[in-house]
UniProtKB/Swiss-Prot annotation:
Disulfide cysteine pairs (residue numbers): none
Keywords: DNA replication, DNA-binding, DNA-directed DNA polymerase, Nucleotidyltransferase, Transferase, Viral DNA replication
GO MF assignments: 3'-5'-DNA exonuclease activity; DNA binding; DNA-directed DNA polymerase activity; nucleotide binding
Entry-linked PANTHER family: DNA POLYMERASE CATALYTIC SUBUNIT, DNA POLYMERASE DELTA CATALYTIC SUBUNIT
Entry-linked Gene3D superfamilies: DNA polymerase family B, C-terminal domain, DNA Polymerase, chain B, domain 1, Helix hairpin bin, Palm domain of DNA polymerase, Ribonuclease H-like superfamily/Ribonuclease H
Keyword Transmembrane helix: no
EC assignment: 2.7.7.7
Protein name: DNA polymerase
Single GO BP term: base-excision repair, gap-filling
Reactions catalysed: DNA(n) + a 2'-deoxyribonucleoside 5'-triphosphate = DNA(n+1) + diphosphate
Family, similarity comment: Belongs to the DNA polymerase type-B family.
Taxonomic source organism: Pyramimonas orientalis virus (PoV01)
Amino acid sequence: MNFRDHSISLDESKNACFQVIDWYHFDYTNEDSNESQYIIKMFGVTEEGYSLCVNVTDFQPHFYISSKTKDKFTQTELDDLEEYIINKLPYNFKNSLSVKQVRKKSIWGFTNNVYKQYIKLSFQNIMSMYITRKMLQYRIKVGRVQVQFDLNESNIDPFLRFIHIQNIKPGGWISIDEYTTDVDDELESKCQINITTSCENVQPLDCNKVAPVNIMSFDIECTSSSGDFPVPIKTYKKTAEEISDLYNSFKSDSHHDGFIPALYKCFMGIYTDEKEFMNDCGTYCNKNLLECNTNNIKFAKVYPKKKKIDLETIFQKLQGYTDTIVDILKNRSKHTVFQEENDGLEPSVVNQLEVLLNSFLPPLKGDPIIQIGSTIHQYGSTKCSYKNVITLDTCNDIPGVDVITCKTETALIKEWCKLIHRVDPDIMTGYNIFGFDFDYIYKRALELGCEKYVLGCSRLEGHKSKFKEKMLASSALGENLLKYVEMEGRVFVDLMKVVQREYNLDSYKLDNVASHFISGKVKTHNKTTLHLDSAAGINVGDYIKLNNTYKCMVLSVDSNIIVIDTELDEKIVTWGLAKDDVSPKEIFACQKGTSADRAKIAKYCVQDCALCNMLIIKLEVFANNMGMANVCLVPLSYIFMRGQGIKIFSLVAKQCRDDNFIIPLIKFDQDSEEVEGYEGAIVLDPIPGIYVEAPISVMDYASLYPSSMISENISHDSIVLDKKYDNLPGVEYVDVTYDIFTGVGDKKTKVDEKTCRYAQFKNNEKGVLPRILMKLLSQRKSTRKQILHKTVTTNDNRSFTGLVDENDDSVTIKTTDNNTITLSRNEILSSVDTYNDFMKAILDGLQLAYKITANSLYGQVGARTSPIYMKELAASTTATGRNLIMKAKEFMETNYGADVVYGDTDSIFVDFKVKEKYGLLDKDALQKSIDISVKASDAFKKELKAPHDLEYEKTFFPFIILSKKKYVGNLYEHDVNKYKQKSMGIVLKRRDNANIVKIVYGGIIDILLNRQNISFAINFLKESLRKLVNGEFHMDDLVITKTLRTTYKDPTRIAHKVLADRMRNRDPGSAPQSSDRVPYAYIEHDIKNKSLLQGDKIEHPSYIKENNVKIDYIFYITNQLMKPICQLMALALFQIPKSSKPEIYERKLKSLTLDYEGNKKRAIDKVSDLKQKEIQKLLFDETLVHLNNKRMGNREILEFFSVTPV
């Protein structure tokens, strides 16, 4: 490992070239002149792996203002404006403003390229810009008149504007030709190289490589004085909870006479043993207390910060506050110590007690950090180059790990901070570091008085960073509270948040994530020896999980052959990397044990760190997110720490600058809510059924919404908002009409229509948004092709790079410079992939970023809080998409006699009736449907405006569709011999269902698709129900998980919230936090008690196991399995023995249609409900009756005849 703990000299005659990793901007005040100057710092890494900081000292923050009432200002008026603003600025900002009049176009509405006057305000520092921005919200006297100015682009961060102006990528390569290494002391950083330059010298460097970035993963281990989950700063909350529990145990005593003696007795043991307490407090403590009844409640011990405490004084104070404690418990306290200001909410009894106890009892010690593990790898390497663990107390050596031991926790934290400075990581990562590690480290440092070391870990010299708590909300993650210590110049990546955002997994525990992603196939095995498809990522001492069941340790690795520590006789098919399970209790015990015991914790800690490095590599986290940052023109840190809005805004702002447009500042009214909405994406009503003999081909519009914006030129600068720009001679227009609705769901009502008019520019030029989208889609297409590039070398050492088309005799190369070269095979010396796996990963991340960004642009146009929000654009886009879906449906039905059985947003599902028309079955039918789909999509393309294209995507065969957005089938693309099961919306895709649903419902689906036998499906269901009620399924298959939100309207009715609160009462430290997924299972309860809420019917799996609580199997049948299975099997009702005849339901449908006054949809839904009820009666009722009788203790009639029910 090459540590970055030494400076590097640069030759100023050579360009400074580096890849940017992070950005920081601030105002720097010169102590001599007292003038403030705006500074941009770029932190990066050179090709050699050196860390570098560039100070850009002369960029001027600026924004624009305009007036609706006054278009042009004289120089005198501009001077008056400048003088007015300067006079309002603080004294040391007097020389920081310049005012200039410029000509620009407004993006807000079509103006036929008409320019107008704007005033550009430029500043020496950002603070004066902020002050002026606020000042201009009010009318200002210019000359003799009061002018209300409109702000434009005052919401663009100056350093983002610098990125736009210099045309650089915020995570790309930079070249600086003129600079100085003589940097002011105040601007020095801790990087190895420090330079200062002018903004004009910062130029983009065309380079596809990724610098050898240092990525450091870290993890902490803590112990607990109480045996509960560790808490960094302790209060008397647990004692308060115990007092409340003790009080409740005396509720049968109307006067609570026994409570006070019991309180004193329980209190005796929290600091010391009873005997010592009695000796110290004998004067004040009646020894008869030892005989009093505490209802078997014992308070947990606490550990004050001071070793010596005055027990006598404590007991005196306790006696003095006894009446107050009782008042609180009776909810009568008005003591000022309990008053809370937050939202006027009445604090809970426990909170009031906690505040009181904290006010007079000695402060407590928090639970210490006992180890911090760190592992480092450089981008481009697949292995960690350095592993380190810092331990509290002694620890045995660990092979390959640098073990540093410390005598105190303060020394441990200081050593870790030193390590950060030595390694100088560019990226810091870990698992749940925003939810646990950072917060814990900071709070422990705060209690120990060494927080200055933690707050000094940034790359800024002499800078004290801040601890931040930040709420980040997104559609992918919901609400997230991020807690972290700022380290300017370093980028934080919480791997747990990344995985939660991008992947849908059953569990987000590190063990499960590792085994899911770092996994493969077992080719062959012989007891302890396994031949894997690839052993990449596996090291000696690692743990792997086989068949997702058996956890084994790896004893040796030789190429792709490994030896494990367990003999296995059954067939092993899959492997996945796992982690060594060490429970919290084991960690607590090991810390109190020997050096060898502590080494066990250390190995576990380092293993968790290294897993994060491996996942960063495997998931290409750095390459993918850096690609997104460069596409959206925002720093890498914004991808992890900011929302979607800023990414799209920066991209649009750059295009506007290039096109000489100005973006007005939208004024948001926080209190107003739009009553009217518009119609979203179209979803065609499905024809539900099990399509066994009819292949269903799917045709999909490529990038429907981006293409719709391009084809109709939907943009801020093309929509006609001013009548004077309507019907201009020589200008063509396109009208888009959309429906306006009020209400949602069943109350959604169409109230009007609105037509928007979009100007079509000359020479097929496009507006700002379509141009951005065209670039993104074009760049994505070329990047995807680039991944496929090969480099062909001839015998005479000529080389050609591009797309290669091979046939038997020759090879044709379409080169990167658009030439076509054809070579005979005899001329070719070699043909290899142009890019290695790392470069392919970078390119793949880039093409994905282009796709996501193109789709996000439409979303931001329709988001009320977006700086580019305009509802009309979003509504016009969805209206265009709906029209195109209906057009495709009509074309297929009219020209091919097909049935469109479903349509969703951007695709149609088509039955070309190949059996009826051609008499084809099985694979012949499948191939025919694929062939027709390809031809039909080509024929339809002639009916579409560019760039729209309806492409053949896939064919389902068989296909089951239940309702809108709920279907499943075997998916084929072009090869009729290769398929995979694909589903949408069905219970198999829901994360809040128990695994039993996947086993039973998934098993039925598998039988229907692959065996196409209803009887087999019914028998499988009955056998599964038998196993369930007999307890033959593992409890893990019955666990449900749901995400815990920060707030709920009525938390008492949210089952997992009630459970989380119950867990918090049992053990505050281990309770789930906001955004955590809470696991639980349903347990048996008193079914006669109708007042029980859902939260009273569930428990945490570990609690169920430890206390032998019975599972409620009836719930899993009625609430998890029955509804989806009844909905599925109702599609095949008439094939089930003893079912009703079809004619009965046909008559019922006609009757209900009349009853519902012709509302056929409502009648169909009612008939569907009746079919599902019949399925329940046929397949479930017998088992449910049996279970209910068993729970109620009722004997069944068959028992009297010695017959066992099925």
